[in-house]
Curated annotation (Swiss-Prot):
Cofactor: heme
EC number(s) per entry: 1.14.15.4
Record localization: Mitochondrion membrane
Class of enzymatic activity (EC top level): oxidoreductase
Function: Has 11 beta-hydroxylation, 18-hydroxylation activities and aldosterone synthetic activity. Catalyzes the final steps of glucocorticoid and mineralocorticoid biosynthesis.
CC terms in the record's Gene Ontology section: mitochondrial inner membrane
Single biological process term from Gene Ontology: cortisol metabolic process
Residues binding heme, per UniProt: C465
Protein name: Cytochrome P450 11B, mitochondrial
Domain of life where this protein originates: Eukaryota
Pfam families with a match to the protein in the record: p450
Family: Belongs to the cytochrome P450 family.
Record gene name: CYP11B
Length: 517
C-alpha cells in the first residue's frame, strides 16, 4: 500500500502500540445524546459566556496527532474512515476533536450544529486545504481553479462560472447533451445484451459507469464526444480515468503526512500523485486546444458546451478557464459514477421502489412529451431516490469549513481558524435523524418532515459543489433511461460493504442483471 510505504519513510520513530478497532458496526445511535439545540454564539465583543467550556475540553480521539496516525496506518483504517467517524460519534457524542498527523479538526453531525456552522462562514467560505493538489499547480505552473482558490480570487471566478455551470438557465442549455449521452449508454448496453443468447446481461458496471460519466461530462464541457461508449475507446481517455482514480487513492494519505517530506525524498506516493495529475492535465489540454482553435477561427455554431461559452463571454482569462475546465473534467468521473452504481444496486434489491420509479417516469413522459426540462421537474420520487442514495452513500464523507470567527457549539468554544467537519456518513445513518435509517426509502424526502441540513452531499451555500447541476442532471437522466429500458435485478440482497478512497466506493462492485422491458 502507498500509505504504508510513506508511513515507513516518515514515521519510523513511532512505537508499536495497542490500537482501537475502528471498523465499528453500522450506527446504533447515541445512548446519551439529546437532539435539543445546544448552539450558542460568542458575545458581540468576542468574550465568551462564563459557562462556556474551552476548546481543549471537547472530547477527543487522542491527544497525540502522530500516535493517532500510526494507529490508522497500522490498522489500515484510511479505507474505513467513515466507519471510524461513525464509531467516534457513538463513543464521544455529537462533537469531538481529532488529530491525525498534520490534520486537526472538530467533527459534528447534528443538523442544528451544521446550520450554525454555515451561518458563520461569511462571503469567502474556506474548505479544507488540499496542499498536494495546490503544490502540483505551483510546480507545473498551472493556474488554480475555484476548487482550490480562496478569498476574492475564488469569489470572482465562481460568480462567472455559476452562470454557465450552476444556474438553471445554464442547465437548460446543456440538458440535451446529457440526454443524448444517457440514451447512448442504453444503446451500448443493448449491443452487449444482443451477444447473450439469454437475452439479458449480468455485469459489473463499475468500469462502464466511469466511461459513461467521462463521456457525458466532457460532452457538456467541450461540446464533443470522446467515443468512450464505442467498442474500442481511445487509450488516452482510459488513461485519464485511471489517473483520476490514482489521484483519489493517493490524496487521502497526503492529507495527513507532511507533503514537504514526501516531496523532498521523492516518495512513490508523491511521484504517483504528481504523475497522475500530469496525465489529467495533458488530456484536458488536448480537449481544450481543439475548442480554442475553433473559437479563434471564428466558426459560427449554436451552443457547444461550457468552455465555448466561457470563451465567448471573455470574462475569465484563458488560464483560469483552462484551470476550471480541467477541475470539472477530473471531478466529474468517479464522483458521479459511484452514486449511479449504488443507486442501481439499491433499486435491484428493492424491486417495489424500482416499479414505482418506472411508473412515475411513464406518467411524466406522457404528460410532457416534448419538454425535457419539464419532464425532469415531474420526477420527485426519482429525485428522492438520488437523495436517498447520497444519504446512505455520500460521495465525500465530510463537508468542511475553516471558521472565520469564534463560535460556540454544545457549550464548547471553537476558535476562528479551526477546521470543522460535518460527518455526512454517520449523519445519514443516524436513527436519531432518520426513521428506519438503514432502509432505502426515496419517499421519505417527499414527506412533510424537517429535512433542513440533512441532505448535504453537494455541500451548501456559495461554496457548494460547482458541478452539482451537471451531476444531478446526469444522474437523473441516466436512471430515467435505464429504468425505461431495463429491469434491474441482483441475487445478493446483503448490504454492500464500502471503503473510503477519498470518495466512498464499494469494497467489491455488485453484480447486476439487466433484462429488456
Amino acid at each position: 500500500m502507498l500509505e504504508k510505504t510513506a508511513a515507513r519513510q516518515i514515521g519510523s520513530c513511532l512505537m508499536r502500540c495497542r490500537t482501537l478497532d475502528t471498523t465499528s458496526p453500522l450506527w446504533t445511535g447515541f445512548s446519551r445524546l439529546s437532539t435539543a439545540p445546544l448552539i450558542h454564539e460568542a458575545r458581540e465583543d468576542g468574550s465568551l459566556a462564563s459557562q462556556t467550556l474551552p476548546y481543549e475540553a471537547i472530547p477527543t480521539t487522542g491527544r497525540s496527532a502522530w500516535f493517532n496516525l500510526f494507529q490508522f496506518w497500522r490498522k489500515n483504517s484510511f479505507q474505513h474512515m467513515h466507519l471510524a467517524m461513525e464509531e467516534n460519534f457513538q463513543n464521544l457524542g455529537p462533537i469531538y476533536r481529532e488529530k491525525l498527523g498534520t490534520h486537526n479538526s472538530v467533527n459534528i453531525m447534528l443538523p442544528q450544529d451544521v446550520a450554525r456552522l454555515f451561518q458563520s462562514e461569511g462571503i469567502f467560505p474556506r474548505r479544507m486545504t488540499m496542499e498536494a493538489w495546490s503544490k502540483h499547480r505551483e510546480l507545473r505552473n498551472h493556474k488554480q481553479g475555484v476548487f482550490l482558490l480562496n478569498g476574492e480570487a475564488w469569489r470572482s471566478d465562481r460568480i462567472i462560472l455559476n452562470k454557465e455551470v450552476l444556474s438553471l438557465a445554464g442547465v437548460k442549455k446543456f440538458l440535451p447533451f446529457l440526454d443524448e449521452a444517457a440514451a447512448d449508454f442504453v444503446t451500448f448496453m443493448k449491443k452487449r445484451m444482443s451477444k447473450n443468447t439469454r437475452g439479458s446481461l449480468t455485469v459489473d458496471l463499475y468500469a462502464d459507469l466511469f466511461r459513461f460519466t467521462l463521456e457525458a461530462s466532457s460532452y457538456v464541457l467541450y461540446g464533443q464526444r470522446l467515443g468512450l461508449l464505442e467498442e474500442h475507446p481511445n487509450a488516452d481517455t482510459l488513461r485519464f480515468i485511471s489517473a483520476v482514480e490514482t489521484v483519489l487513492k493517493t490524496t487521502l494519505p497526503l492529507l495527513y503526512y507532511p507533503h514537504q517530506i514526501l516531496q523532498l525524498f521523492q516518495t512513490r506516493l508523491w511521484n504517483e500523485h504528481m504523475h497522475a495529475w500530469d496525465v489529467i492535465f495533458e488530456q484536458a489540454d488536448r480537449c481544450i486546444q481543439n475548442i480554442y482553435q475553433e473559437y479563434c477561427l471564428g466558426q459560427e455554431r449554436g451552443y457547444s458546451g461550457i468552455m465555448a461559452e466561457l470563451l465567448l463571454q471573455a470574462e475569465l482569462p484563458l488560464d483560469s478557464i483552462k484551470a476550471n475546465i480541467t477541475e470539472l473534467m477530473a471531478g466529474g468521473v468517479d464522483t458521479t459514477a459511484m452514486p449511479l452504481l449504488f443507486t442501481l444496486f439499491e433499486l435491484a434489491r428493492n424491486p417495489s421502489v424500482q416499479r414505482e420509479l418506472r411508473e412515475e417516469i411513464r406518467k411524466a413522459e406522457a404528460q410532457n412529451p416534448n419538454d425535457l426540462n419539464q419532464l425532469l421537474n415531474s420526477l420527485p420520487l426519482l429525485k428522492g431516490a438520488i437523495k436517498e442514495t447520497l444519504r446512505l452513500y455520500p460521495v465525500g464523507i465530510t463537508v468542511q469549513r475553516h471558521l472565520i470567527k469564534d463560535i460556540v457549539l454544545h457549550n464548547y468554544h471553537i476558535p476562528a481558524g479551526t477546521l470543522v467537519q460535518v460527518g455526512l456518513y454517520p449523519m445519514g445513518r443516524s436513527p436519531l435523524l432518520f426513521q428506519d435509517a438503514l432502509r432505502y426509502d426515496p419517499a421519505r424526502w417527499l414527506k412533510r418532515e424537517d429535512t433542513n441540513f440533512k441532505a448535504l452531499a453537494f455541500g451548501f451555500g456559495s461554496r457548494q459543489c460547482i458541478g452539482r447541476r451537471i451531476a444531478e442532471t446526469e444522474i437523473t437522466l441516466f436512471l430515467m433511461h435505464m429504468l425505461k429500458n431495463f429491469q434491474i435485478d441482483t441475487v445478493s440482497k446483503d448490504d454492500i460493504k464500502t471503503v473510503f478512497g477519498f470518495i466512498l466506493m464499494p469494497e467489491k462492485p455488485p453484480l447486476l442483471t439487466f433484462r429488456p422491458i
